[in-house]
């Protein structure tokens, strides 16, 4: 690398009755760096691999080459749908009171989402879903009961991963009966080939409620208000903290109608976080070596991004790679 010099005019200094100007040279120093594998490395899973450094690098970032830490994937935010090994929606549900089932759960990938603040736009969408009895969705089966205990149901949603959404419909078929209380905790788990498992907990999901009940005609997005007969979401004012999502039931005849819907806004489940590196050296650190332990056999390419930057000058970041194979211990 050639040394570059950039000259600029320094700020004018006031000295009593005279002024003077000067020039200052900022030096771009050539980077000298090398990385070598320690001769004592065994390259067995569970044993540390040691990297020895020499040179004048002031900053070092390492990408260890294992899952989630490959330099070549530092800008990757999406993988092919075929790289999804499994995709599951887990719903933990508690049901209390009443003798009739008042809840339908459904999932799919044909839903474009709701506006969330424009009822004139959203109402026809929800009405169409209601009119065709969720024909474009797959209903999620669960066992109705009033046991007031949480039960967990797991659903394979891999086929919906490109634009996944799920939702619920609460209804009141017989005003002479008690409306059941529901408490729901959802979670989505996506396993990939060659990437860390991605988990979507409730805070990662955005829900939009919409009521088609006549008493909510002027406020169809109603939720998180006090009292029975309302849908409540955790993390918003007025939440019921017994679960992430709660519909508070009521005694017979307390409400003339319940036609409450809620939808998770669609999300592409093949979206991932970019791979990351680890900063292991700064200007003031003395780092003659670095070690890392691999727990899985395989061929790894480790990338070190190194740069210089101190009072003597600086250098542009440069990559250095080392490739090796790790095997399981021989019995």
Residue positions per predicted region:
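Exposed low-complexity, polar/acidic, P/S/T/G-rich flexible segments that act as propeptides
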Residues: 175-220
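Short, solvent-exposed loop/turn segments at the edges of extracellular beta-sandwich modules
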Residues: 174-175, 307-314
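Short beta-strand-plus-loop segments that form exposed binding edges in beta-rich domains
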Residues: 168-176
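Residue-level recognition of secondary-structure-to-loop junctions
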Residues: 43, 284, 288-296, 300
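Acidic/polar, low-complexity intrinsically disordered N-terminal segments immediately downstream
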Residues: 23-102, 107-115, 297, 313, ...
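Extracellular carbohydrate recognition and processing domains
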Residues: 124-159
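C-terminal motif of bacterial Sec signal peptides marking the signal peptidase cleavage site
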Residues: 18-21
């Amino acid at each position: 690398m050639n040394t570059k010099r950039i000259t600029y005019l320094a700020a004018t200094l006031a000295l009593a009755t005279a002024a003077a100007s000067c020039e200052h040279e900022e030096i771009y120093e050539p980077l000298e760096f090398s990385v070598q594998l320690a001769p004592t490395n065994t390259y067995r899973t569970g044993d540390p691999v040691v990297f020895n450094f020499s040179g004048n690098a002031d900053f070092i970032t390492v990408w260890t080459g294992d899952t989630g830490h490959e330099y070549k994937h530092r800008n990757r935010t999406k993988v092919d749908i075929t790289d999804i090994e499994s995709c599951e929606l887990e719903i933990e549900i508690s049901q209390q009171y009443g003798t009739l089932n008042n809840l339908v759960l459904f999932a799919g990938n044909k839903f474009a989402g709701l506006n969330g603040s424009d009822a004139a736009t959203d109402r026809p969408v929800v009405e169409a879903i209601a009119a065709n009895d969720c024909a474009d969705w797959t209903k999620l089966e669960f066992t109705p009961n009033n046991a007031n205990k949480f039960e967990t149901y797991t659903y394979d949603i891999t086929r919906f991963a490109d634009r996944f959404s799920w939702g619920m419909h609460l209804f009141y078929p017989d005003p002479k009966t008690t409306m059941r209380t529901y408490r729901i905790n959802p979670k989505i788990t996506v396993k990939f080939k060659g990437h860390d498992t991605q988990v979507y907990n409730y805070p990662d999901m955005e829900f939009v409620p919409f009521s088609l009940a006549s008493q909510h005609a002027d406020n169809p997005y109603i939720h998180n208000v006090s009292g029975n007969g309302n849908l409540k979401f955790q993390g918003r004012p007025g939440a019921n903290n017994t679960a992430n999502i709660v519909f508070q039931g009521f005694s017979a005849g307390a409400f003339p109608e319940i036609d409450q819907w809620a939808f998770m806004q669609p999300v592409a489940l093949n979206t991932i976080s970019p791979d990351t590196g680890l900063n292991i050296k700064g200007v003031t650190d003395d780092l003659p070596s670095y070690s890392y332990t691999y727990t899985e056999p395989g061929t790894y390419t480790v990338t070190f991004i190194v740069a210089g930057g101190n009072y003597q000058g600086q250098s542009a970041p440069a990559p250095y790679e080392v490739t090796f194979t790790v095997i399981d211990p021989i019995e």
